[in-house]
Amino acid sequence: MILRRLLLAAGSLLLASAFTSAKKADGPKITVTKFKHEPVNLFYFDDSDVVMLQDGNNGDVYVSRNAGTKWDIVDVGEMKGQAWSLMPHPMDRTKAYVLGKGGKHWVTNDQAMTWREFTVDAELSPYQLPLVFHGKDSNRVMLQGIKCSGRDCVERTYYTTDGFQTLHLLMEKGRHCAWAVSTPMFGDGLDLPKEVNDRIFCVVSGLHSQWPEDNRLLYSDRFFKDDSGIEAGLDSGRAVSGVIRTASAKRHLLAATKSRRTNELALFVTDDASGWHRAEFDGQRIEEDAYTILESTNYSLQVDVVSTDSSAMGTLFTSNSNGTYFTRNIEHTNRNRQGLVDFEKIATIQGIILVNTVKNWEDVEKSSVVEKKIVSRISFDDGRTFQPLKAGKQDLHLHSVTDATNYGRVFSSPAPGLVMGVGNTGGHLKDYSDGDLYISDDAGINWKKALSDAHKYEFGDQGSVIVAVYDEGRTNKISYSFNHGKSWEKASLPLPDDVKIRAKILTTMPDSTSLKFVLVGSAKADSDVEHYVIAIDFAEMEERTCVDPDFEKWPARLNEKQEPDCLMGHKQFYRRRKADANCFIKKKFEDPIPNFEPCKCTEEDFECDFNFIRSEDGKSCVPARSLLAPEGACKNPDDKYTGSSGFRLIPGDACIKKGGLELDKPIERVCSDTMKTPAAGEIAVEKTFFTADNYRDYFYLERTGSSRGDDETVIMITSEQEIFISRDHGKRWKRIFEAETITRIEPHRYFNDVAYFLTNSGEGWYTLDRGENFREFKAPLPPNQDKLPALSFHPDRRDWLIWTGAEECNGSGGQCHSVAYYTTNRGAEWHFLMRYVRRCEFIKRDARGSSDKIVFCEQYEDENPSSKHLQLISSEDWFAEKKVHYNNILDFATMQEFIIVAIRGEKPQDSLSVGVSIDGKTFADAELPANVKIPIQRAYTVLESRTHAAFLHVTVNNLEDHEYGSLIKSNSNGTSYVLSLSAVNRNSRGYADFEKMQGLEGVAMANVVANVDDVEKGAAKKYRTMITHNDGAEWTLLAPPGKDSEGRAYGCSTKGGKPTKACALHLHSYTERVDPRDTYSSPGAVGIMIGTGNVGEYLTPKSSADTFITRDAGISWEEAKKGKYQWEYGDSGSIIVLVPESTPTKTLLYSLDEGRSWKEYQFSEVEMQIRDISTVPSDTSRNFLLWGNEVGQGKKPGLATVNIDFSGLKERSKQCVLNEEKPEADDYYLWEPKHPLQPNGCLFGHRAKYHRKRPEKDCYNGREIQHLDSIGDICECTRSDYECDYNYEPQTDGTCARVPGLEPLDPKLVCTEDPKAIEWYEPTGYRRIPLTKCQGGKQLNHIIAHPCPNKEEEFEKKHPRLRGIGLFFAIVIPIGLAAAVGYYVYQHWDGKFGRIRLGETGSGGFFDRDSPLISIPVTIVAGIVAVATALPLLVSSLWRSLGGYIRVPGSGSSRQPYSSRGAFAARRGDYVGVVDDEDELLGTDDLEDDEEGEERNGQV
């Protein structure tokens, strides 16, 4: 009977209880409990009969104190119905947690006897594990949550050190945090500092960026209380950006990093939370989501790395003891797309591993649709060798982790030597339903069939009892065995009539010492599903307890001679119950204890020492790099010294050296093996000639920070269509694709390692590893004939491509058009996308929805190319459905933050407008500034948009050789544009003279046409160069050097060192470059720029140019050399090379001190005409490549490349030391960029510090360093943090005034566009620069506030009015203070102005204080001064009480004095200025004349 009265009494969903079998002696006691909803999160408290589970539907939690026989609902406080998750503490058998909804949670410290509630002001994070546990102190836990306000969410991490009695905020915006001591074994055997116990590592976003590639790993030993954390020195003590997450594995802590423009990962490992090392995987590439950290040993890490594109197979690696060098164990391991690997270590026994591998791996590598044939393998020597599983003479194959059907381990348990699995014999593994249950009681050496069909199984009483339940369908029986599976009995489950269950879980206590089991299953009852929790107890079936004769000494491992085998220096034995013993062990909660016998040391007890790796044959350890000789040794190369043998005993290995091998005994080594002696100072040169006269193009496939290897790959296509590749930066070249006609090379736009080589037929090749290997692919059509790229690349998915090919273009009479196809596996399979397109592009996923499949296409309207109407359409499902955004566009551009569309107008037909989107779904018309005078908008150039604002060049004059336009800048969503700079030069191809400085945000240079009026009349253009340091809000001329490189003064003069129209530095820009890659700046050389130009009123022809350099981001310049040079940066700016431009030469100039001094070097015996100088795009290499032809006497024909290698130079032969904790202690200093018009050193509202090598230090930077060290003080807002708002324009004094006759944007729109908005502000003419981080100070864009409709209550709470007594004092106190000050001044007038008396002491003088001519005016004046000082507060208070709100930025009144003559002249009737007494925000102090004001603000 179902005891329904229990339901009514308990008020729970517990619907049934206690069906008990009648038999006791010949069958187990079975109790059934029925639940309405599926039980989830079931677990035992270790070493107890206490079991817990959670109702999977209604949030209730249940506990059983008798191993599942009876269940009670946990009804504590408000817990009932509120459980979101239930989990045990993984390392404390007394603790568990109920994580609730709404920030309420509960903890037990006594195995669910009592519960304590704690609250958190955040919801649980859906992105991270909610709880993070300390490995050795169970009271230390971190909780990872998320706090949302509307759509804005901030991740929060909390911590407790007292088991949630108190809870503290650790940090906000932490993406993932972990304790340094994350496992019980971490640090064992090491003398770790005490602070490591408190150490926490957190992955946080970059200082200037939210992109994952800029993530940093910070740590703190003080819970981030007194510091913002120290950046972990992962790579030789240097910080590494792009940290994805951390993970722990027994004795090791790991951090995975990924650089921008690659999907290759670097894995860094530490065993002490201080010293990190990069893990080397024997040449194997590790990619994102392509490795799995497996259950590791106490002395090594085991990692499975994906080895195929489809993630179907991997390679198993095992590390040395410190986790730095990994060796291959077995290839072609079976894995699935979720990262699960068919791998399990046999519990409690060292060295035995079960894996599944793919037998037909060659076929699987060729095609992802081939079905894998899986075979099982076992290792008895810790993965060194593997062999088949044997059931008799047949090979046995078992289902493993990738298709596990039960909780916990798949094959083994703490029961010594007992291993079970579902599988089959034969050539390979079949379906699960075709499998039978097999068992081994000798740890996998021999197997036999236990039961037919697939079963779930579990071990109890240290293996004395084995329980199995049918797992191919429904059942009402269980099977059990008392003799290691030799024979089996069945027991019926006391379920209601005709009820059978499908087994979901079969489990017992974690140590497998109990005679009690729990089975969870479900059964269908009409349309409902019923759930049962079944307790199975064997305790009463066998009364006898085992004694000594019932046990055997069982060896855990046997060698090939069936003798006990050694591992880690000992043999392992267990005292195990004999299979046929008629007894139970009955030692509940006592884990089996192994016994060890020591062995003599063999080769297997040693590993490679630090800085050594296994030789190719695996028999010896060879140096991984040049060895370091002991101090005082190796005075001569032929000397010898005593050093490491290359081996060391594996830490923890207990072998006996006496009488065994001693591979770690020091040996005598020759000094020639040691680190090379200091370089002799030579620069190496390698010249290569080609038959072609010139190169058509070249590309670098550059390694990133997380890439393995040391190659510097260059690919060149010559003027004769020949393809050459060099892996060592042009020292040696190899021709590739000799038999093919490659017509174009398309490097992947987003991944450095990838390039495609295309032909006109549609056949092609690609490389994924920077030219190390090439693979063929076949496109569905030949490339399109629209002179557009055939390939479009996905920003995040390396293998996703769109191919735009030509159809019906072979002269067959059809209508030639382009058709787009897509692939998600690099062309192995192509799928139709759209017909009659011009081009299609993937859209970057970040901030633009959750779909990776967003594609934008330009398609001819009605699929009719003759209409010339291009539609902009998009889709998120490969155009199963599509959305039309615009019907008649000219083009569109996808940028990092915006999608910008040029839309054809209807009247007139050749006009254009602009549409903008930030999410790829919703477009808005761009509001262009009315003060940009454009008769017809005919051309736009979309410029860089990495600073949360888009820059557009809008053509004003489109006549050939007279082109120029306006540079306009958007707000943060790209829709509202303001004029940034007028008359910016462009050429006939649409390129503009505008360039942003690399490595430093907000600095840009542009060339303007200085004689616009004359150009409109047909005159030639004259140019000036302008620079901005606040992202286009203000522009100035370049300050010229005081003297030239020869110490002579220039023929013009500045005003106080400031440039004037008649005397400034002007540089040749983008439109004059042969190669647009030759930029002023470098991402690696922060703050340095080089250009060619002249000092004077205008830019002169390039033939008369000299070369100039700046080291402070353009604030000051100096002449580097007379004449025009090509330049290139190397080693992040520690090497700068100059080569004459357009002049034959044998020599080059180089500088090792940022251009302060130069040395000449001859690189050729014959003069050469150098066409270009190049290096890797990041400018981190010490190699350069010259491209040119010999032209002097003795010349050789053809193109020549010259590799210039500075790595052997003495001054660049030692790597610089960068200590993240003390960044200025060694070879680096911290450089702070500044704004030229800001005395406080602030730039974009903060002070940033960048690592820069000290120029005087003789060392090299090496791989790309993380230049940005920190963001220091956040500055108060000043005028430099604002730009003119829409329909406002800058005046000569720096203020912003409304354009006559135009209205500002409707400020109330914020209320409709943002549902969370409480208030709107009246327009002031100013808006914040999107890039600024300033806080407080001058809020020029927020002066007078008004409530949004229906938000008056929230507005009132934010800005409470003064009422009653508050209002009274606000009025009376200022007046009283004024009177008091006036009276005081009157009383003390005699002492004012330091009056000097010349012997007369009498009073009554004309100017005596008692004179009515003095006393009355003094009192009046003093009172006016005091009242004038206090009245702004009074007026502000009264105004607020009337409903508005005025934020007074300074101590001035609402109507301010004029700051200059220019401001007085410019003020309009509707303009209100805001000026602070201490800092004139809207103008310049004491400008000499209006011209200087113009120059300062860029209005020329």
Swiss-Prot record:
Does this entry carry the keyword Zinc? no
List where the protein spans the membrane. Answer: 1365-1385, 1413-1433
For this UniProt entry, which residues form the secretion signal?
Answer: 1-22
Family annotation (SMART domains): VPS10
Locate the compositionally biased regions of type Acidic residues: 1481-1494
| Residues with glycosylation annotation | N298, N322, N810, N973
Q: Please indicate which superkingdom the organism of origin belongs to.
A: Eukaryota
* Membrane-topology annotation of the record: Multi-pass membrane protein
Question: Lumenal side: which ranges?
Answer: 23-1364, 1434-1500
User: Function of this protein?
Assistant: Functions as a sorting receptor in the Golgi compartment required for the intracellular sorting and delivery of soluble vacuolar proteins, like carboxypeptidase Y (CPY) and proteinase A. Executes multiple rounds of sorting by cycling between the late Golgi and a prevacuolar endosome-like compartment.
Show the PANTHER family listed in the entry: SORTILIN RELATED, SORTILIN-RELATED RECEPTOR
Q: Per its record, how is this protein called by name?
A: Vacuolar protein sorting/targeting protein 10
Q: Which organism is it from?
A: Ajellomyces dermatitidis (strain ER-3 / ATCC MYA-2586) (Blastomyces dermatitidis)
